[in-house]
Design a protein with these regions (language model features):
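Sec-dependent bacterial lipoprotein signal peptides
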Residues: 1-24
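Short loop/turn and low-complexity linker motifs enriched in small/turn-promoting residues
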Residues: 21-136
Length: 136
């Protein structure tokens, strides 16, 4: 018997365990604005705070209509480099609407990292300044 098939068992177990932890995405409340997150591979973008208060689920933001400040953390990896950077960013937007879906899209060019807040029509309505990055 070959050793390779036996090595697949721990790898598959880890994948299944990690996917089970996340759970399904909750349904968006019609009275709230929903902000999804989108990052460039291999980076991970996580929701951290709304108006200074920690969020329960780092995969999205859900806010009441109006003015809010969203804080995010980006775990950035350079292709071919094992060093990870932890980057913090903030976006402020005054016109969140109930029932509207938004997307916070991370993009990077060289060492410059930013994120754009897009409304449901794909129009940029706000953006972060450059992220503050430190070695992770």
């Amino acid at each position: 018997m070959s050793l390779k098939p036996l090595l697949l068992i721990p790898a598959l177990s880890a994948v299944l365990l990690l996917s089970a932890c996340a759970g399904p995405m909750p349904k968006a409340a019609p009275s709230e604005a929903w902000i999804g997150l989108k990052e460039e591979a291999p980076n991970d973008l996580m929701a951290e705070r709304v108006d200074g208060k920690r969020v329960d689920d780092g995969r999205f933001f859900e806010v009441s209509p109006g003015d809010h400040r969203l804080d995010v953390t980006l775990f950035a990896e350079e292709p071919g480099d094992n060093d990870q950077q932890n980057c913090e960013g903030r976006v402020e937007y005054e016109h969140f609407k109930a029932g509207e879906r938004y997307t916070l899209v991370e993009s990077s060019l060289g060492s410059t990292v930013r994120a754009s807040l897009l409304d449901g029509h794909g129009k940029e309505v706000a953006a972060t300044q450059d992220f503050n990055c430190m070695p992770g």
